[in-house]
Amino acid sequence: MPDPYKLVDLFCGAGGMTYGFREAGFEPILAVEKEKDFAETYRRNFGDHVLAQDIADIVDAGGITCPADVVIGGPPCQGFSNLTGNRANDPRRAMWRFYMDVVESTQCKVFVVENVPNLLSSPEGKAIVRRAKQLGFHISEQSMGILRASDFGVPQNRRRAIIMASRLGPITLPQPVSNRMSVRQALKGVPRKPTATELRRTPAKGSDLHIARNPTPKSLERYRLIPPGGNRFDLQRAAPHLTPDCWIRKTEGGTDLFGRLLWDEPARCTIRCEFYKPEKGRYLHPSEDRPITHWEAARLQTFPDSFKWCGTKIRIAIQIGNAVPPMFAKHIGERVRQHLEEFGACPVPAHRVAMASGREAA
């Protein structure tokens, strides 16, 4: 069996991107995640090669010298997001610099950045491109763009910016696949009724995550008035007295708020960190009068039921919502592996990884 290409995942979170690349044939050798419970989730699923540290501290202390074939990651995206207003001075916007420092120090052949769509038009996105070219990477309009996860077998309309670059030669983004997955397919086998309101154990997996909130009578009234595919405007038409004043004053936009999913198409939403709050987006179950559960959100993100989650229910929700859907990552990984093979790239030898990993641990 050929030696696999070696992978480093920065800002790895729970490991959705690692999972997809591993499915595509890569071997994860190092990951970095500063949030301790997120890193523990990663460790439980992929092994002890995760560093629960701030990437800035690692780079300042000498950096990562472990050689790798590919570096992947999503520098914290809140500083670029439309949802967070004007964040010109947000320190998280500078995290790309440390990412590119690791790209340089690992001497990787390919790197992949995943982020919110605004990254591509931001000064930081343009700076990533400039730095990549300075380091000798091929990067072009064909290797970066906005992809929709539903075009890659993920049952949600998640739009993400992808930047790919290669030292070997021109690389292109993956092409959409034909097998679109519906909410019904994604939630097959999940009972309609949640089993609890709190986590019973941690690490939690599969049905352990089928937990629901205790809605107030007013919330239940609101849920019942939202038809399949409907949203807050249906509530306003049917029951103005149950509609918050701020929604009534906001006559445009916000069409996902208090939205209900449809069974037979991908979710018309992005699974975010507060998917258990329907006032935050289109998170009502297709036919039950409740928000989706953690288990259902993980399914819509294409995580397998065997995946182990660590932390409180709120922290697990953040991990689920922040994650790159593994199926999306798998298609990106397959494109990267195809590119490496087309150029006859040899994987970093295992003994070089072992030697460098020993130095990192020390």
Task: Name the predicted role of every residue range.
Residues L7-F21, T65-L83, F111-V116, I163-R167, ...:
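Conserved proline-anchored active-site loop of SAM-dependent methyltransferases
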Residues V8, I29-L30:
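Conserved beta-strand positions in the Rossmann-like core of class I SAM-dependent methyltransferases
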Residues K36-E40:
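Short alpha-helix immediately C-terminal to the canonical SAM-binding loop
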